[in-house]
Amino acid sequence: MADVAVLAELRGIDEERLKPCADWVAAHADTHLPIVAEMDGHVVGAAWLLGVQRVPSNESLDRWYGDIQSAQVRSEYRNRGIVGALMAAILIEARTRGLLHVTVHSGRRAVDFYLCNGFSHHRQILLLEAAASPRPA
């Protein structure tokens, strides 16, 4: 696995939060896989594939889906196809793991990128923003 300090730095995590970040990465190693892009021996980008097990059904007791999280490339390495290579690696991993589907919560600027990589808008995936929802009394 890539050095946690490098992954944290890519995410903009402050140095004083490095230990809790490393603890989080270790605690989530079974569900969160970082895929890294390197150039000249340096990590220049990363993206995470979250694997989540779904409730069993009659068709399968082993149902998993994926979610792409935190795809980032250092600004000086952008527009070189790196994020495309990260996406290709993530989608290969998703197929290897037999994930039913892969979702992504994208920023506006990246929507077209994901659409060009096979993603589509889906009418059955709904989102409730936790901050906007009322909390139970």
Region locations from a protein language model:
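Short coil/loop residues immediately preceding or within conserved phosphate-binding loops
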Residues: 32, 63, 68, 121-123
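A conserved beta-turn-beta hairpin within the catalytic core of GNAT-like acetyltransferases
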Residues: 53-68, 78
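Conserved acetyl-CoA-binding loop-helix of GNAT-fold acetyltransferases
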Residues: 73, 79-92, 116
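Conserved active-site alpha-helix within GNAT-family acetyltransferase domains
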Residues: 84, 96, 100-101, 107-130
